[in-house]
Design a protein with these regions (language model features):
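N-terminal secretory signal peptides that target proteins for export/translocation
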Residues: 1-8
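Bacterial N-terminal signal peptides
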Residues: 11-25
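Beta-strand-enriched cores of mature, soluble protein domains
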Residues: 27-184
Length: 184
């Protein structure tokens, strides 16, 4: 009986050590693959290409809007896993009362090598009216990297964004930061 318990204990110890080393190796490899992203995009590189606004009619200023944004990226502004991002198309919709409320969307980053990265966006916009009557619209949200093509098929990640925008003037500028990893 004593001999059996020693064998059982040895086997159990070997299994625990193996599992621990395996989990440590997986966690270490996963952590090594995470890459940081941080960039700012000035207003002249983004524009609303389409906007369709419908008044809801329940309260003044309540509108639903479908929009499309095109962004161009100059050399070396945004590089993902060694490949330069050339442009981005974002298509989304918002549910605003006087430019306050939620917005959602879907985006595609096009890379220099022809690959694409797909994104989902959600967040909230807030309009602040200054004493002089001028207005500042700020969108704060989260972008989820949700796969892609070619080299970026397994890309995942999260970016936080803050964007200043004026849908009437077509102006958009902002900053993005977060991290991504590519699952094999």
């Amino acid at each position: 009986m004593k001999k059996f318990m020693l064998k059982g204990t040895s086997v159990l110890l070997a299994v625990i050590v193996s599992a621990g080393l395996t989990l440590f190796g997986i966690a270490e490899a996963w952590a090594q693959q995470k890459q940081k992203i941080s960039y700012k995009l000035p207003a002249e590189l983004s524009k609303f290409t389409q906007q369709h606004v419908i008044d809801v009619g329940d309260v003044p200023g309540h509108q639903v809007r479908i929009f499309e944004v095109h962004r161009t990226y100059p050399k070396d502004l945004l590089v993902v896993d060694g490949v330069r991002v050339v442009e981005e198309w974002l298509r989304g919709y918002s549910d605003y009362i006087d430019t306050n409320g939620p917005a959602w969307g879907y985006g595609i980053y096009s890379l220099e090598n022809g690959d694409k990265i797909f994104t989902r966006l959600h967040g909230t916009s807030q309009a602040i009216v200054h004493p002089d009557g001028s207005k500042k619209n700020t969108f704060t949200g989260v972008i989820t990297l949700a796969g892609g093509t070619g080299k970026f098929r397994g890309i995942l990640g999260t970016l936080r964004t803050m964007v200043i925008f004026d849908p009437k003037a077509g102006v958009i500028e902002g900053q993005w930061e977060g991290e991504y990893w590519i699952e094999k």
